[in-house]
């Protein structure tokens, strides 16, 4: 078995080498995992020599999905005509997006093969804050909903331990782009207190039910920014600020930097217990369909234990690619990542590796030669695929 595995690895490596000059697996989207994926050649799990994707374009989940579903590179601020091979998104593919893909005659299933959506890593959404002189903050989920909806407007309305906070306006730092991080946050806040946060969306204004620029509650303060890096820097440089962010852009286990929610910091083993409550579609008891991309990404609106703002960051592919080099590299990523080879990298970026059952389920479904859903299946991809 080891000899066979070695031969397979050598063969795959040779194929990757032969494809090196022509390969250009291009994509982007969510800024949440951009450091993990790699924004320069060799600095991430996608841009390493194996599998050798092009640098990830970190923008927002909404922009990544828009570029992928329309095959329009300009939505990621790339040159027009560049083929988009995948998207990174913390925002789950919607029923409408899936159905539009399936029914499209030009940029969907008929041309590119079935849609694939797979989780890459679990993530918390951290709540960074900056209140001068304060080094610990614990908020309930309900308080958090009231802060982001403008009902709590001053830190004197909040206790820091047993001491009331200073007379200082709360400054909410929110994402103005189509952010999957926003969607994970508001999915939880809506589940806990829909009177304050009536929606869950990649659009902050849609989720809270008002435009923070033109129609914010009287007395509230909102500062809109684009991207995870901007959230981190704005909170750090603004007294009274609070925001929400990828754990990879902040010191997520430091109580002086990020708030505890319901008594828990974003780091913690209890998050793994929450993830283990969901079975992958390949499990016979899951009640899910492996061929349905919507069934591959569960949500956790209000976990019963541990840190409550959690979700998955995902990748979106098509099954078919016209460039054999693209197929080789995408399959190489699926093989390595879902064999657990990137688990240490995932952890080092403050994310949580997928449960073993999920790793195995993705690998057996979208990589194994016996699966009809595998990327590059010639029986499905004969004459079709995402363009060169």
Labelled PLM ranges:
Residues 1-22:
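Gram-negative bacterial Sec-dependent N-terminal signal peptides
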Residues 23-388:
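Flexible loop/hinge segments at secondary-structure junctions
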């Amino acid at each position: 078995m080891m000899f066979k595995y070695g031969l397979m690895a050598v063969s795959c490596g040779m194929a990757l080498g032969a494809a090196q000059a022509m390969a250009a697996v291009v994509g982007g989207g969510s800024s949440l995992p951009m450091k993990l994926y790699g924004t320069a050649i060799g600095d991430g799990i996608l841009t390493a020599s194996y599998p050798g994707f092009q640098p990830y374009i970190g923008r927002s989940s909404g922009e990544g999905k828009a570029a992928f579903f329309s095959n329009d590179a300009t939505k990621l601020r790339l040159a027009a005509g560049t083929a988009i091979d995948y998207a990174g998104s913390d925002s789950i593919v919607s029923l409408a997006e899936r159905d539009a893909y399936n029914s499209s005659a030009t940029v969907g299933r008929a041309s590119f093969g079935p849609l694939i959506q797979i989780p890459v890593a679990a993530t918390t959404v951290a709540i960074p804050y900056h209140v001068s002189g304060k080094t610990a903050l614990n908020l309930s989920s309900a308080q958090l909903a009231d802060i982001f909806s403008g009902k709590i407007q001053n830190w004197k309305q909040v206790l820091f331990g047993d001491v009331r906070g200073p007379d200082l306006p709360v400054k909410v730092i929110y994402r103005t782009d189509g952010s999957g991080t926003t969607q994970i946050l508001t999915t939880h806040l809506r589940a806990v207190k829909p009177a304050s946060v009536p929606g869950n969306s990649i659009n902050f204004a849609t989720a809270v039910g008002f435009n923070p620029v033109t129609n914010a509650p009287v007395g509230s303060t909102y500062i809109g920014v684009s991207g995870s890096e901007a959230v981190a820097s704005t909170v750090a440089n603004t007294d009274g600020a609070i925001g929400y962010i990828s754990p990879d852009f902040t010191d997520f286990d430091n109580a002086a930097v990020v708030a505890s929610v319901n008594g828990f910091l974003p780091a913690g083993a209890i998050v793994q217990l929450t993830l283990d409550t969901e079975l992958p579609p390949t499990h016979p008891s899951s009640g899910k369909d492996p061929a349905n991309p919507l069934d591959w990404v569960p949500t956790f609106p209000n976990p019963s234990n541990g840190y409550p703002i959690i979700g998955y960051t995902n990748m979106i592919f098509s099954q078919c690619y016209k460039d054999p080099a693209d197929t080789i590299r995408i399959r190489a990523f699926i093989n390595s990542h879902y064999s657990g080879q990137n688990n240490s990298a995932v952890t080092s970026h403050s994310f949580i590796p997928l449960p073993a059952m999920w790793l195995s389920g993705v690998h057996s479904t979208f990589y194994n030669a016996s699966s009809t859903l595998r990327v590059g299946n010639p029986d499905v991809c004969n004459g079709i695929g995402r363009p060169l």
